[in-house]
Amino acid sequence: MTLFFVLAALLLLGIMVMVHECGHFFAARLTGIPVKGFGIGFGPKLFSRKSKKTGTEYVLRLIPAGGYCSFYGEDEVDGKGQNDPRNLNNAAVWKRLLTILMGPVMNFVLAFVVAVGVFMSIGETVDVRYGYVHIESVAEGGAAKEAGILPGDIIMLVNDQDMMGLADDGEQFKALSMIDSFREGDEPLKMTVERNGEMTDVFVTPRLDAAENRMMVGISCRIELEEIKEDCSLIRAVELSADYCVTTGGLILDALKGLVTTGEGLNETGGPVRIIETITTATRDYGFLAYLELLIAISVNLGLVNLLPIPGLDGSRAVFLLIEGIFRKPVPRNVEAYIHLAGYLVLFGILIFFTYRDILHLFR
């Protein structure tokens, strides 16, 4: 079963890469730029065919996670192919810019279309109801432990107030807010818990945690959650999807900013192995909806990262094209090629680092 989820994760990555490369491919075909090769996957070659009409070689490889769309002379250093009419650099700047940008754009389109499908299928969340508090663990020496609360207990009432069906109006974590507002000298909190089908009253006196600077009882808990949904129209699904994708993109940019400026999140950042592990675990534990949500998030991520002006990525190539368009003269091709090569080497080194760390993480 685990193999199934791993293959599903590889398929997800393959779909995103294929859509990205298809963006480059169809933009090139639309603008008349010859495509040298178009491939999906990596590993042993399963299928290969060269078009007699266009000269494009189409390749399908075993592992569906990766791909490419190559052009004549795109990273040429010696300039030998500059007179070749198929050379990418001989095409108009706007044609090359459109071809470069359509890869990331198609990732955004994929994320948006999937999001619309999700909202049309499951509806719009119009309300959230919170329920009973399930105790997962109890800290040794904490107030809850001394009061007799045990893992597996379910908090039904706090000071005789029912925890079930609380609306999302600021009271959804009423049990926890009562703990936060507790002050020394107050009466202990009366918690009615369900234990093995029976109701038991326990009296808990929260304590100030110096590290957190808040009142705590020493429990790890899970709160029941029910989302109230309504069917939404196509127009509403489009609105929700646009907002969802923009919000997701904003969170990704904030995370990238923190990673670059302060190193925040470096330990949580991973490469392909970590991504596959995350997709596998989420799909296995939470189902197909989680799979689609990850597809949306990773697709937006792929589109945004590729637009960054990092040598070797689409964003960097777009910058060189903008310079050429503004000054009517390209940066020397060999200079641009070496800059992209340096970018590839750095990115490859980063990829190796994260892959190595992810593999170590798997076997800990």
Residue ranges and their predicted role:
Residues 258-262, 298-313:
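Transmembrane alpha-helix interface/packing and boundary motifs in multi-pass membrane proteins
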Residues 353-364:
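Juxtamembrane boundary at the C-terminal end of a transmembrane helix
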Residues 1, 5-9, 91-96, 100, ...:
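Residue-level signature of transmembrane alpha-helical entry/exit and packing/kink sites
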Residues 13-17, 70, 107, 111, ...:
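Alpha-helical transmembrane segments of multi-pass membrane proteins
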Residues 79-94, 106-265, 269, 273-276:
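PDZ peptide-recognition modules
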Residues 328-345:
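Interfacial loop-to-transmembrane junctions
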Residues 5-12, 293, 297, 343-350:
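Alpha-helical transmembrane segments of integral membrane proteins
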